UniProtKB/Swiss-Prot annotation:
GO annotation terms (biological process): protein secretion by the type IV secretion system
Subcellular locations according to the entry: Cell membrane
UniProt keyword Cell membrane, yes or no: yes
TM region(s), chain numbering: 9-29, 59-79, 93-113, 162-182, 183-203, 209-229, 255-275, 302-322, 329-349
Gene Ontology CC entries for this record: plasma membrane
Entries under InterPro entries matching the protein: Conjugal_tfr_TrbL, Conjugal_tfr_TrbL/VirB6
UniProt entry tagged with the keyword Glycosyltransferase: no
Region (Disordered): 374-395
Record-given protein name: Conjugal transfer protein TrbL
Compositional bias ranges of the Pro residues kind: 383-395
Highest taxon in the source lineage: Bacteria
Family under the similarity heading: Belongs to the TrbL/VirB6 family.
Amino acid sequence: MVVHPSPKLELAFVTIGFVLLASSPALAQQGQVLTTLENSVVTAAKGWETTVMNAARSLFWILAGIEVGIAAVWLAINAASLDSWFAELVKRIMFIGLFAFILDRGLEFAKAVVDSLYQIGAGGGSASPANIFDAGIRVATKMSEQAKFGLWEDNALAIAAVFAMVVVVVSFSLVAAIFVAVMVEMYVGLLAGMIMLGLGGSSYTKDFAVKYLVYAFSVGMKLMALVMIARIGSDILLGLAEAPTATSEQFITTLAIAGISVVVFVIAMYVPPILQGLVQGASVGGGMEAIRHGGQAASAALGAGFLTIGAANRGFAAASAARAGGASLAGAAMRGLEAGVGGAAGAVGSAAKDKAIGSPGAYAGSMLGLANAKLDQQSGRPGTPPPPPPINDKK
């Protein structure tokens, strides 16, 4: 008996091949979209610069007048001499003049600080969200050379390469999204924070104006750290993809690239805010938070690995049964692939449905854990019994 492969499975593999071939130009255009978004934010922010600056100047001179008036009242109450009046006048003129200069040049100074730190992080080169996204596309394009499906090809390596490509593109897309968010914070924060410079007209509120300059330095540090992390991560991944071990140990290198891209994303998400909080004198996060989320990502990867192993075992069993029934080698291989991929997809879909409807025993496990249990049940292996439902002590 000859077992023919499923037409749906053949169509799926053909579709995947076309998507892999056509995805590079489309994804490359996404970098231009990020650049356009950044330029749009800059243009929109500049439209508010005059309005915010006029409001800050009005607030500054109102507070400066109040400051001079209070000083004059205290001098009159204390019956100060002419020398005291002259000394107080000089002191107030120097104070108001200094903060008036900061108000007039504060935005330019803040942008200069941020740009200088930004260039330090870029290492003298160019860095932008589009460049970060393009770096992920270059790594994925390099790995697409290993995604070759066929009867005489290493299909396990091809599946791992496709999986790693998806992980790399998603991770660098998220890093680019973080970059865009920080850039928006920089433009909007520095512009809206100009109103704080208007509070420098009084000695009682001058600390707010100083905090604006501290904020500018903290945003620059955040950008510098993010650019450094993105450039170092992309260089490491490109080096791994082009290293000699990429051809001798292809499977291990492919999985390592996928794992490192996730690590780069987690570091880019948590380390820059920590540096920003360090400059501002407040801790906004810790290393344990990054470790916790990294552990969650590792648990998800481990669950996906076990699910892949279970699907492979199911496919091998189906292929062996088909071969024993008289199927050809190609037919048995396709039947095994159909059983493995179809079983894994069905298990994940069933687990997602149980999590969505809140089935008994689904509340305490992850979706991948439930999918592994369902795949074991389909294969006839005993699975772990579901935990008991939570006890409601409230009557």
